[in-house]
From Swiss-Prot:
TM segment ranges: none
Any Gene Ontology biological process: glucose catabolic process
Keyword vocabulary terms for this entry: Glycolysis, Isomerase, Manganese, Metal-binding
Protein known as: 2,3-bisphosphoglycerate-independent phosphoglycerate mutase 2
Encoding gene (name): gpmI2
Domain of life where this protein originates: Archaea
Known catalytic reactions: (2R)-2-phosphoglycerate = (2R)-3-phosphoglycerate
Keyword check for Isomerase: yes
HAMAP family listed in its UniProt record: GpmI
Organism: Methanosarcina acetivorans (strain ATCC 35395 / DSM 2834 / JCM 12185 / C2A)
Length: 521
């Protein structure tokens, strides 16, 4: 099929274009995708075959009903098989009791007992299931209780993106009540993920988070965690943006700070937003900001955050063999991965099965994301710069396969600001039109799809509040280009890699359990 066109002197690129957050929803209320002017995508949907792909729940290795996300989506896309996610693995471990015998977690507890020190549990206090899950925190609290620990402190990072913007007050109340019923754990600090979970090296944010944890110094102090959240709401801050707040005792001193010989368990399982704080604690060569204090701690990562750091991992990664990038490399094909900063890790690390390695023949291009506080201030983000560069790469004639991600619909969708999301959709549509035109001139074709939904639902239909989380809606996949493809059948994200290989005429490895979406009839 495609290989008959491909095996000429001039390479005709096959592109996988991932429009992050481009979900499908028929209802128009709060639907930024339907509200936007999208002549290019509309034209492609009318002209070329397309299908629906499932991108949430069991279709991507998550619990039934759990919304998808970018990490999960790109893992499944690259693997060509359903990849059972850390959330699913850890949930099962809690249910069957293995969690409470996990040797890495038990080592952290043994360190506390040996040194008569403290256990710090830090992470996102959320039922979102994207970066963490409340059940895992509760299991850690029970484990500490069962092992007789008395000094257990929780550093609560608040969500507001993968759940409603003001979900934290109820979650903190629930957590506080659970702590009182299950041992002696107490909440020591509260702050929004904007500070504690930055991933774009905005070190001034990470420093505020780190100082609250290690020095007990923060913009605000409070007598209890619930008051910290309600005071933040009174200041006009939603969960994501709650400024670091230290909980103090009756003596006015911090409830707890991280000290030498303490143990830390960072209970987030998704790596990208756990790295910066981990580097601040554990990287000897860290230069993001001056560390006034660097306690020597026993530091445990719930999952692998950075393979260059030799840290204990409670749930280490399961290696995936023969992912898309590896198969293309073995075939001697030249591939490009391109995205702006916000999604660069997704088209590289996650698409390669959660591995940092770069395959032979794999080029990578990172376009910096704009340095703005929130992306509603610049809905186009760096899409135009990404487009200029990818067109230049298409015209170079160097690449057989190009994987591109546009971050806009997801990142601007997370702000909950409808008008900005509409502008984001329109910016991406303009870019899609330019790229497809360049592909046509080069004799190339594209599969245009998404990893999950977001911008199609910007409003909570029950409360009228902004909807800032991903959705569980399906996404579309368009075959855009001339050729033999007449129809596509519905599938899931793990069918994309087999489809790309089918188009290239490359045999699918047996590890890939997905199917080609191409209907031959």
């Amino acid at each position: 099929m495609w290989n008959s066109l491909h095996m000429t002197q001039a390479r005709r690129p096959l592109m996988l274009m991932i429009l992050d957050g481009w979900g499908y929803r028929e209802a128009s209320e709060g639907n930024a995708i339907l509200a936007a002017e999208t002549p290019n995508l509309n034209s492609l949907l009318n002209e070329f075959p397309w299908c629906f792909l499932e991108c949430s729940g069991e279709a991507v290795g998550l619990p039934e009903g759990q919304m998808g996300n970018s990490e999960v989506g790109h893992l499944n896309i690259g693997a060509g098989r359903v990849v059972y996610q850390d959330l699913t693995r850890i949930n099962l471990s809690v249910r069957n009791g293995d969690f409470f015998e996990n040797p890495v977690l038990l080592d952290a507890i043994s360190n506390v007992k040996l040194n008569d020190s403290s256990l710090h549990l830090m992470g996102l206090v959320s039922y979102g299931g994207v970066h963490s899950y409340m059940t895992h925190l509760y299991a850690l609290i029970k484990l500490a209780r069962d092992k007789g620990l008395k000094k257990v402190y929780i550093h609560a990072f608040l969500d507001g993106r993968d759940v409603p913007p003001k979900a934290a007050l109820a979650d903190i109340r629930e957590l506080d009540a659970f702590c009182k019923e299950n041992g002696s754990a107490r909440i020591a600090t509260v702050q929004g993920r904007y500070y504690a979970m930055d991933r774009d090296k905005r070190w001034e944010r990470s420093k505020l988070a780190y100082d609250a944890l290690t020095l007990g110094v923060a913009p605000y102090t409070t007598s209890d965690a619930e008051t910290a959240v309600s005071d933040a709401y009174a200041r006009g801050e939603t969960d994501e943006f709650v400024k670091p707040t230290v909980v103090t005792g009756s003596d006015g001193k911090p409830e707890a700070v991280v000290q030498d010989n303490d143990s830390i368990i960072f209970f987030n399982f998704r790596p990208d937003r756990a790295r910066q704080l981990t580097w601040a604690f554990e990287n000897d060569d860290f230069d993001g900001f001056p560390r006034e204090k660097r306690p020597k701690v026993h530091y445990v990562c719930m999952a692998q955050y950075d393979e260059t750091l030799d840290l204990p991992i409670a749930f280490p990664p399961e290696e995936l063999e023969n992912v898309l990038g590896e198969v293309l490399s073995k075939q001697g094909l030249v591939q490009l991965r391109i995205a702006e900063t916000e999604k660069y890790a997704h088209v590289t690390f996650f698409l390669n099965g959660g591995q940092e390695k770069c395959y032979d023949g794999e080029d990578r291009c990172l376009i910096p994301s704009p340095k703005v506080a929130t992306y509603d201030l610049k809905p186009e983000m760096s899409a135009y710069e990404v487009t200029d560069e990818v067109i230049r790469r298409i015209q170079s004639g160097k690449y057989d396969v190009i994987v591109l991600n546009f971050a806009n619909m997801d990142m601007v969708g997370h702000t909950g600001i409808f008008e900005a999301a509409v502008q984001a959709v329109e910016a991406v549509d303009t870019c899609v039109g330019r790229i497809i035109e360049a592909l046509k001139k080069a004799g190339g074709v594209a599969l245009i799809t998404a990893d999950h939904g977001n911008a199609e639902q910007m409003e909570n239909q029950h409360t009228g509040e902004p909807h800032t989380a991903h959705t569980s809606n399906p996404v579309r996949c368009i075959y855009a280009g001339k050729g033999e493809v007449k129809a596509l059948e519905n599938g899931k994200l793990s069918d994309l890699a087999p489809t790309l290989l089918d188009l290239l005429g490359v045999p699918k490895p047996e590890e890939m359990k997905g199917k080609s979406l191409i209907l031959n009839e």
